[in-house]
Amino acid sequence: MKKTDIILIAVVAVIIVLGIVFLGKSEAKVEYDYPFTLKGEAGLVELTYSEYEEKIESNEPFIFIIERTTCSHCQNFMPVAEKFAREYNIPIYYIDTDKFEGDEWTGLEKSNSFFKKNSGNWGTPTIMILVGSDAVDYYQGETDSDGLYDFLSEKISLSTNS
């Protein structure tokens, strides 16, 4: 065998081994039955950090918004979210990060799959569909009622008050 053939075989073997190692470490994707039916009173519900942790631990699906009262995009979006929640009879939970104390930021950044994948690379408002610590889907930025409907309608059971 030529030296180049041996090198080629070694390179292919290394690629195969690395592929097996990395594929074996990939997270198992959880499959969900959509649409989710949400529990709770319709409307916008502010959570403290400890209440957010309780929602995560419940493993029930919920819509979660991260916002800041000092964020102009949040100021525009939150009234849209409130009207949407009432119109479609769903609870939408949110947390105001301007009210965080101590290590609540650190806790939030470790609390679900979205933050683990996007560490430090996100802004407000961010809307997530969470089941436990699994961020099933998310939308970053301000949107209108139609955009919110487009984001939520495939995964959340929506019915109007009419």
Where do the PLM segments sit?
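Solvent-exposed loop/turn segments at secondary-structure junctions
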Residues: 69-73, 98-102, 134-136, 145
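Short, solvent-exposed, Trp/other aromatic-anchored flexible loops in extracytoplasmic proteins
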Residues: 109-122
